[in-house]
Amino acid sequence: MEIIMFIAYAVVGTLLALALAASATLTLQGNDQVVANMRKVEVPDSWLPRLAALKAAGAVGLVAGLWAAPLGVAAAIGVTLYFVGAVISHLRVKDFDLAPAAVLALIAVAALALRTAA
């Protein structure tokens, strides 16, 4: 059963890492849509490089978690907290276009559960 959980983590974790890496890249490039979404929830532009770094670190940690379980668990916890914070940021300004952040938070929780079970 552990091997099935590991394979499931490998798929979910890798796909989540790819999404995080793409998002980090777009954030660092100052993509208009990303910047507009961040401004909509009142995130200062000066925070964008730090938030991109957090997403990139999460991506690296999820992939490293394929070889070192504690890194995968830590990364999944961090990514979950990041996207829970994103959901809270949307709710704080009464912006209910929060499905992407909520879905990514749930995927991060799934990665955490799978890596813990593997």
Predicted regions and their residues:
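Membrane-interface extramembranous regions
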Residues: 2-118
